[in-house]
């Protein structure tokens, strides 16, 4: 009898799954509300509606939100990190803040194999690019790579699941093999800011034989935490000859100080000349 049931369930395939979702509707993975049976993403419409673009003003280079009464009077508008020339990439943006909905959605894609989220995120990023296409001008789309051991363990690279459909939407070549991670990430779950920078230093390289010279690269990842990963990838790409690197992530982790005015904006007259990166 058990064999017959398994066989019947296999024959039913998607129909069986749809029937089960009607009889036993799944809860939203953020708020617990019961989902509509047609939803491929296990997050309700109300929670998805909270996934909103970061509000400006933003740092003109890295996209960090800047809360300051003087922001409108400063040009160019740079955060203290970009004023110091910390980042190697030319431009970066994140779609949303890494809040409750964004963090849960990213983790579901990353660890729970909710793969439709990759294309859903890609649509959001494509909309962000449409707001400023010149800043994202690129020849190729490249996902931030996982180390080979981590890729084998997880079975996929979440950045690739976002970058591939995004490249298709933009009509650009997708180059998943252009960058490789040559140093593994420590097993420690949470890293300090200093540890994040140290562990990615020299962790990426272009694949041997890859054609990178004079390329404009759109680099895609899931989360911008400190910017260390995008910076390390950008340095590897530039070393191989890339002329421009723009970074794009689904979400950005904002520091606790985000709730207070950013007192570290530097007036234009006090800014150094050159990129400093």
Regions found by a protein language model. Name each.
Residues 1-51:
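N-terminal cysteine/histidine-rich coordination modules
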Residues 2-9, 14-16, 25, 164, ...:
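PRPP/pyrophosphate-binding module of the type I phosphoribosyltransferase fold
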Residues 21, 140-141, 216:
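Hydrophobic alpha-helical transmembrane segments of integral membrane proteins
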Residues 24-26, 142-144, 172:
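Hydrophobic alpha-helix-in-membranes signature
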Residues 38, 140, 170-180:
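A short coil-to-beta-strand element that immediately follows conserved catalytic motifs
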Residues 38-41, 151, 255:
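Glycine/Thr-rich phosphate-binding loops of Rossmann-like dinucleotide-binding domains
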Residues 39, 54, 136-137, 173-174, ...:
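Alpha-helix N-cap and coil->helix boundary residues
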Residues 49-169, 189, 193:
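Extended interfacial segments that mediate partner engagement and assembly in macromolecular machines
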């Amino acid at each position: 009898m058990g064999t017959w049931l398994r066989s019947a369930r296999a024959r039913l395939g998607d129909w069986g799954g749809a029937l089960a979702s009607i009889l036993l509707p799944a809860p939203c993975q953020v708020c617990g509300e019961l989902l509509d049976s047609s939803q491929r993403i296990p997050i309700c419409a109300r929670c998805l509606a909270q996934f909103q673009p970061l509000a400006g003003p933003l740092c003109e280079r890295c996209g960090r939100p800047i809360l300051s009464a003087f922001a409108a009077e400063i040009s160019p508008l740079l955060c203290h990190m970009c004023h110091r020339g910390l980042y190697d990439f030319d431009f970066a943006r994140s779609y949303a803040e890494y809040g409750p909905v964004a963090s849960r959605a990213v983790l579901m894609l990353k660890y729970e194999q909710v793969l439709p989220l990759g294309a859903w995120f890609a649509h959001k990023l494509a909309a962000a690019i449409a707001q400023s296409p010149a800043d994202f001008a690129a020849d190729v789309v490249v996902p931030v790579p996982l180390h080979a051991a981590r890729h084998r363990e997880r079975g996929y690279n979440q950045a690739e699941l976002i970058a591939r459909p995004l490249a298709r939407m933009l009509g650009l070549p997708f180059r998943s093999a252009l960058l490789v991670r040559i140093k593994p990430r420590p097993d420690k779950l949470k890293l300090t800011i200093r540890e994040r920078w140290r562990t990615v230093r020299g962790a990426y390289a272009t694949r041997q034989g890859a054609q990178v010279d004079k390329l404009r690269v759109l680099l895609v990842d899931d989360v911008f935490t400190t910017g260390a990963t995008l910076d390390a990838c950008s340095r590897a790409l530039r070393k191989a000859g890339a002329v421009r690197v723009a970074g794009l992530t689904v979400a950005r982790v904002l520091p606790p100080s985000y709730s207070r005015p950013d007192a570290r904006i530097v007036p234009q007259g006090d800014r150094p000349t050159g990129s400093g990166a």
